[in-house]
Amino acid sequence: MRREASGPELADHTFRNATDLLADRVHTAPDHVAFGLRTDEGLLDVSTRGFDAACRDLAKGLIAQGLQPGDRVAVMAPTRYAWALADLATWLAGGVVVPVYETSSPDQVAATLAGTTPVLALAGGPEHRDALTDAGAASVWTMDAGSRDLAALVASGREVPDAEVERRRRLAGPDDLATIVHTSGTTARQKAAHITHGNLVGVVQAVRQAWPEVVHEDAVTIIALPLAHILARGLQLAALGAGMKVVHEGDRTRVVGAFAQVRPTFMVVVPQLLEKIRQAGRDRANDARLGPVFRAAETTAVAWGRHLEAAQHDPAARPTRRLALAHAFFDRLFFRRLRRLMGDRVEWLLSGAAPLDPTLAHFFRGIGVPVIEGYGLTETTAPATGLRPGDLRAGSVGTPIPGTTIRIADDGEVLVRGVGVTPGYEDARDGEDAFVDGFFRTGDLGSLDEAGRLRIHGRRKNLIVTASGKNVAPEPWEAAVTRSPLVAHAVLVGEARSHLTAVLLLDPDAVRRWAERSGNPDVLPLLAGDPPPGGRRLDHPALLARLQRPVDRANAAVSRAEQARAFVALVADTTASSPFVTPTLKLQRDAFLSAASTHIETLYTT
């Protein structure tokens, strides 16, 4: 097994900072459509020239308000076009962007501001303005119309000369700080990672070099992930640099509806969105009394996806006649409708921010929408590895991007060195153990195959050491259970215990649908009202019997010592605003287990 793999050399480029990406597009394609704004009448196009002019006007306002080169600007807003303006305008003025997740608690907002000391803040709406003001932010301006809105900020800078903006634009070099991005904090407190201009432009160039079939001038994408997350901002910069049209949609409930209007060719998604799309197909089939037929179609799609994967490196591979006929039949009946649901133009999806179930990856490839899996962290400026078209392997997160090296330490930890790796943190203490021999320690466990493809096996901090000394990585078991549409999150527990048990956090909407369709209406009252902080226990016999199936399947796939002997089913707040869920919908494991400790104890006392 390989211990190290490197991507190709990064192609030479002349970009010194992130604003050079925009300046280059203004020079080469000023009238090309860079952004689309969703309106009731349709999409309102914004050219590269128009975006650049708006950014420069906003930069003048920031300068007029006293922003100096190197000063920090906090941005707290949902994903929207004005976020992109704020990002580039701050850099044009010589500032450093500090994103604040719009779902942050008051304590988190206060901690972010105290740790990074921004001199000015840009808020999405009144609720974000109030959150920033209450946390002590100075000079707060809002993106929504109001007395201190972006129009007023722009107006304040009318006397700032164009030459001053251009002078400041050229100040930052590759080693200068561009943004301070907080980690998601799934297992520990958030850390404020420094991302330089060199990190940003290097990763943008690497992405364009690695995926020219995906990132190009004729491509269109919807950005629905939080722009406070480095993955979404990296995509936005890559799209801007390559000429890809970007449309923002900050309301997750409207993303599927945006497909028909925007008709994207590519999207970065989280696995939960893919599951929702598949579930939409199931729901429509059930409504048409075709549920069993759709289940057969799902099986066919997965089999077809596996065939396509095998055929990548074996030109002689042929599907069975039965599979080919079944796929053609279900394509007419279901698959083309699912593609139409996504706008009927999607060529590629990139899944990031959380592990993707291989079966789900095969399903989407089987319906004609291949999924590229990638891997990265805040500290690697998002992608460090990724699968390539022509070499899609479900369960793998691909080979290193150009300019990046992956090493596997003796204990299995994934180490990263390369163009996107952070130089450190705002609090130097956070970086004391972050590097070894020039490589960043990711905290993830993984392995490399002979072709240099990386597989992630779990988090070091999530390892469970049982009373017998057995080390158990919980992620494989948890991933198997969450294949059930009823389960939003599964958590294996058993640190210093004689055996393992599990907590299943259910999806209330999925449970509601199951209850209505399975003839168990007495489950519905159990879902009413807001659950307590530690979750509400659901002990309905039929529901528990239904949940036992995915638990049994997961147990069958692991050794006896890694099996859960009992489980508890809970409903809790699992939206992005939950204190237990990150903005990218990953579970904050330690915080949740602490809140659910009473439920866990019952698994060992009964």
Predicted regions and their residues:
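Conserved AMP-binding/adenylation subdomain of ANL enzymes
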Residues: 201-220, 227-335, 345
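Conserved pre-ATP/AMP-binding loop-to-beta segment of ANL
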Residues: 30-33, 158-182, 189, 214-220
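Structural core segment of the AMP-binding/adenylate-forming
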Residues: 64-65, 92-156, 546
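Conserved AMP-binding A3 loop
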Residues: 45-49, 178-204
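Conserved AMP-binding/adenylate-forming core of the ANL superfamily
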Residues: 34-80, 84-88, 105-110, 114, ...
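Conserved ATP-dependent adenylate/AMP-binding module captured primarily in the ANL superfamily
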Residues: 87, 102-135, 203-222, 252-266, ...
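Conserved C-terminal "lid"/linker of ANL adenylate-forming enzymes
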Residues: 489, 544, 548-606
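Conserved ATP-binding/catalytic segment of the ANL
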Residues: 400-466
